[in-house]
């Protein structure tokens, strides 16, 4: 297909501005009934009302597509994904059906620990190939940008490997999706550091953050701030250190119990707090006041058989709410 493209006779639904919409603003959309999108040399150069697509032969070197009144949307942004990993967890499905909780599965070596073990056993090429396959499927569903997390290594070598794979895919000239990388070394406590969470946070701060920053392997730093994983104080210490080194901040927050993760996200000026199934009223208000995006992951709640996050209450409180897949 030509790099020059005209899509005309489209009903375009498009956002305006470059900042997040909050509260009632989220219900406002710009709709262009007889719209045109112009792409020149692979770059979108015009979105707006029709302006005569065949005038004076201007577009004779463009490929023309008549949308016939169908809806045209911007590409989806999936702002919370883990697409670089090894293995699968099909056996855990039966455990869930029998009523086992997320944390009990983790305690018996399943969940994150299971995927960490499988990921550590795979090399660069195998992990990259699998990740590329996931990106192709996402692209086919209209996704054009993803945030991708590490977090299935929990050691220096494998965490860096995951981030290098994301950089490799993002630098590929044939890529279908733009990737924003997040370092999630604090996804769980590795077996090596069992009972020594503070020491593991020290390791991440001293040995991981500087290397990742120096090599520009990630833009964001994330932490699983949750009872039985990393405490509020441990999360604060890691994120403050990351912020001082120039990382944007994200949190897995208040997924299992109300734990103060939303409040911490607001305190530190995080880009987003994610999950939030158990976020408190105070946490929601604090996020709204601080401009922290509430990223909701309904598929996770569905898989865990948990109530969905209180998205409507977050919007009514003035939060910007995003949806992602996990």
Predicted segment positions?
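Metal-coordinating catalytic core of metallo-dependent amide/deamination hydrolases
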Residues: 115-130, 136, 144-259
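Alpha-helical segments flanking ligand/cofactor-binding loops in enzyme cores
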Residues: 74, 136, 236, 240, ...
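Metal-associated gating/positioning segment near the N- to mid-region
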Residues: 62-129
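Residue-level marker for buried hydrophobic side chains located in beta-strands
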Residues: 6, 63, 75-77, 249, ...
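Conserved beta-strand scaffold positions in the cores of enzyme catalytic domains, especially
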Residues: 6, 12, 61-66, 181
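Divalent metal-coordination and catalytic microenvironments
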Residues: 10, 37, 42, 69, ...
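N-terminal metal-binding scaffold of metallo-dependent hydrolase/deaminase domains
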Residues: 1-56
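Active-site-adjacent C-terminal substructures of enzyme catalytic domains
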Residues: 248-249, 258-326
